[in-house]
């Protein structure tokens, strides 16, 4: 579970690690954009939001707004919280559609109770497990974060937090503090047998406990580009599925597959799937 190389959290506090140089990587590295966008898409699937209904979402550790751009593409409204001024500056330069807030999630989320319909977070929560000052207590900061997150969510909604735990002890620390704050839920692990593609998603419920979706398996994986491509241009972050014709067979199949990944009951695909019904008298 631990990273083979040096982890970013060991290089100092996030507001210093994510400087202007790191921020530029997030908008000019095609592989990084692709990975971040796919993880945001998976997190949104696991939120299990109502179909065809815009929701008001919170993005913790929003960075340059890559995950937020995906939320906008899906028709949702969102607010992003991040501790790095450089990352937020890049988001502003990109003219993203969401609102941005500079803040430390370890000090709590400053919104009224019941503000958000859901929350996602990509590669951020593990930063709370490290103390960069003598006064910082990881367990207390995690509890403060989860307690405030529980408060700002509408009852019955979800939070899906993608994270990179360093070891099993760190994962236990995170889940314990989430449970103490009132959440139920569990961990969804995609591609558990793959060293590179393995992803952890902490699915938290702010209401009664419900089912935990299954993680994706290796035979569902897509090939990730192995080379990073840098450019001076900024990539437009519109998803390819936006080009699908609504109600077409491809659109229906993609929607059914998305529902399966969310854990819903879906009828098997047949030769009649997506076929337009004949008019009746």
UniProtKB/Swiss-Prot annotation:
It is found in: Nucleus; Nucleus, Nucleoplasm; Cytoplasm, Perinuclear region; Cytoplasm. The modification Phosphoserine is found at residue 240. It comes from the Eukaryota. One of its GO terms (molecular function) is rRNA (guanine) methyltransferase activity. May be ubiquitinated and targeted to degradation in response to pro-inflammatory cytokine signaling. Keywords: Chromatin regulator, Cytoplasm, Methyltransferase, Nucleus, Phosphoprotein, Ribosome biogenesis, rRNA processing, S-adenosyl-L-methionine, Transcription, Transcription regulation, Transferase, Ubl conjugation, Williams-Beuren syndrome. It is an enzyme of class 2 (transferase). S-adenosyl-L-methionine-dependent methyltransferase that specifically methylates the N(7) position of a guanine in 18S rRNA. Requires the methyltransferase adapter protein TRM112 for full rRNA methyltransferase activity. Involved in the pre-rRNA processing steps leading to small-subunit rRNA production independently of its RNA-modifying catalytic activity. Important for biogenesis end export of the 40S ribosomal subunit independent on its methyltransferase activity. Locus-specific steroid receptor coactivator. It is linked to BUD23 is located in the Williams-Beuren syndrome (WBS) critical region. WBS results from a hemizygous deletion of several genes on chromosome 7q11.23, thought to arise as a consequence of unequal crossing over between highly homologous low-copy repeat sequences flanking the deleted region. Haploinsufficiency of BUD23 may be the cause of certain cardiovascular and musculo-skeletal abnormalities observed in the disease. Heterodimer with TRMT112; this heterodimerization is necessary for the metabolic stability and activity of the catalytic subunit BUD23. Interacts with GRIP1. Belongs to the class I-like SAM-binding methyltransferase superfamily. BUD23/WBSCR22 family. This is 18S rRNA (guanine-N(7))-methyltransferase. The gene is BUD23.
């Amino acid at each position: 579970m631990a990273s083979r190389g040096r982890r970013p959290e060991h290089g100092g506090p996030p507001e210093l690690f994510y400087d202007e140089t790191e921020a530029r990587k997030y908008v000019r590295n095609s592989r990084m954009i692709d990975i971040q966008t796919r993880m945001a898409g998976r997190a949104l699937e696991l939120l299990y939001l109502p179909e065809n209904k815009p929701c008001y979402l919170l993005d913790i550790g929003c960075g340059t707004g890559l995950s937020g751009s995906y939320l906008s593409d899906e028709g949702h409204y969102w607010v992003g919280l991040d501790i790095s001024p450089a990352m937020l500056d890049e988001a502003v330069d990109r003219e993203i559609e969401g609102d941005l807030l500079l803040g430390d999630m370890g000090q709590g989320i400053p919104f009224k109770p019941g503000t958000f319909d859901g929350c996602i977070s990509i590669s951020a929560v593990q930063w709370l497990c490290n103390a960069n000052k003598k006064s910082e207590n990881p367990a207390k900061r995690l509890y403060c974060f989860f307690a405030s997150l529980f408060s700002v969510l509408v009852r019955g909604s979800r939070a899906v937090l993608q994270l990179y735990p360093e070891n099993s002890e760190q994962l236990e620390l995170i889940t314990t503090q989430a449970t103490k704050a009132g959440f139920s839920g569990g961990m969804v692990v995609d591609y558990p047998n793959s060293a590179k593609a393995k992803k952890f998603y902490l699915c938290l419920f702010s209401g009664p406990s419900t089912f935990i979706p299954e993680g994706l398996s290796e035979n569902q994986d897509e090939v990730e580009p192995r080379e990073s491509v840098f450019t001076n241009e900024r990539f437009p972050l519109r998803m390819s599925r936006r080009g699908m014709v609504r109600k077409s067979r491809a659109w229906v199949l993609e929607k059914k597959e998305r529902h399966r990944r969310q854990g819903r009951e879906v009828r098997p695909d047949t030769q009649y799937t997506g076929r337009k019904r004949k008019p009746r008298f």
